[in-house]
A protein has these predicted regions:
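Phosphate-binding site recognition
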Residues: 1-286, 291
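A cross-kingdom feature that marks ATP-driven nucleic-acid transaction machinery
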Residues: 250, 257-385
Length: 385
């Protein structure tokens, strides 16, 4: 249970153990007592069950201050459960910092005890389409793509969609109506995921203002940070949670790495909701094909493409070719006669071929005019130089 005291957590643990065991359990005073009760109950099942699954969701929430939860868990696992061949212990936790530092990075008894880490990736476009169809929602692929550009591939968000309404109506109800379910999700998300949520939000909100991303040094300077340790941890956590990506601009070494915000829900929230005191409850329905909608769509579609590099490579017939992914930008310098140019996506292949990709959002097949083709060829020549 989120943000409850140790005593409240222990009381709920006792209730659940009573429910599953069918026997009234005394309320434990410590986590050591709680795990001792769990051990006693599981011992009665060892001979009659081929497999026993212990599943604890949101494990970090149990580790309240001075609770000794992690040490009690250590004793339970190393002192007994790990020796039982038919017991599997599965834990989940959205608090990335805790899971990384306290469980995966534990220097005590839980060190190197993890059998396997499970990465729950968001749905891709195809999986999103199949999920929506399973809910009886039959939209065009353009509508599915726009839905993805707003919510990403997060099943929890996609499951909120009501098949009785159109995509714009659903977005209005979920984001802009009074009491909308996703209107405050951003604040809760960061508080539950990260211990120092303020720093993480500052980083994300800064990166949201820079389309191409920022270097580590630029972020430190903009946020007036004097120590790089916390920033490194924050970057790593944000990357592991799929909020941002780290990439190199073509031709630059790792020390010039860029950090870019790529989480689609966050990009949408920061663009249309955060800081807006008054919001039209039908904003999205009324914004269709507006200049603001078109500008957002272009950038969001670029991020959608970056979420589907494997699918792009497959379509190009190079899925099995080792590839580095870059972007590239050259700033204009009139004094030196240097033209400005930018390439959204570069696939630098092991077979000594480089694909230069332009990402364009369009409601219909994009028509490459002779003038636009010439522009692309000129950009290619600038890149070659």
């Amino acid at each position: 249970v989120y943000q409850c005291s140790k005593n409240e957590m222990l009381a709920y643990f006792s209730e659940q153990l009573t429910l599953y065991s069918g026997q009234k359990q005394a309320r434990p005073k410590t986590w050591f007592e709680a795990f001792s009760q769990l051990r006693a109950y599981l011992s009665t099942l060892l001979e009659e069950r081929e497999q026993i699954i212990i599943f604890i969701d949101e494990l970090p929430w149990l580790d309240t201050p001075k609770s000794n939860f992690i040490r009690a868990l250590d004793l339970f696992w190393n002192g007994w459960a790990s020796d039982q061949p038919n017991i599997k212990f599965i834990v989940c936790g959205s608090a990335t910092t805790w899971m990384t530092n306290k469980l995966l990075g534990d220097k005590g008894g839980l060190h190197n005890r993890i059998t396997r880490k499970i990465y729950l990736a968001p749905f891709d476009l195809n999986e999103t389409e199949l999920f929506l169809q399973s809910k009886g929602i039959v939209w065009t692929r353009h509508q599915i793509a726009e839905c993805y550009m707003i919510m990403g591939g997060t099943p929890f968000y996609l499951n909120m969609i009501d098949k009785q309404y159109s995509l714009p109506q659903n977005i209005d109800m979920l984001f802009f109506a009074e009491g909308a379910e996703l209107s405050n999700e951003y604040e809760f998300l960061f508080r539950s995921l990260f211990k120092d949520s303020i720093l993480y939000r500052r980083i994300v909100e800064l990166l949201a203002k820079k389309k191409m991303g920022m270097t580590r040094e630029d972020v430190m300077k903009a946020l007036h940070l004097t120590s790089g340790g916390k920033l490194t941890e924050a970057f790593n956590d944000l990357i592991s949670c799929d909020f941002i990506r780290k990439y190199n601009s073509f031709g630059n070494k790792s020390n010039g790495a860029m950090y870019q915000l790529t989480d689609l829900y966050t990009l949408f929230y920061l663009h249309y909701i955060k800081g807006k005191e008054e919001t039209d409850e039908h904003l999205w329905s009324n914004m269709i094909d507006s200049p603001s909608h078109r500008a957002w769509s272009g950038y969001a579609f670029e991020q959608l493409c970056l979420h589907h590099i494997s699918q792009i490579k497959k379509k190009l017939g190079i899925l099995g070719v080792q590839t580095n992914v870059y972007s590239w930008q050259q700033k204009a310098n009139k004094e030196k006669g240097i033209e400005g140019a930018q390439i959204d996506l570069i696939l630098d292949r092991r077979d000594q071929i480089i694909n230069l990709c332009e990402m364009k959002y369009s409601l219909k097949a994009y028509d490459i005019t002779p003038a636009y083709l010439q522009k692309l060829l000129e950009r290619r020549e600038i890149f070659r130089q």
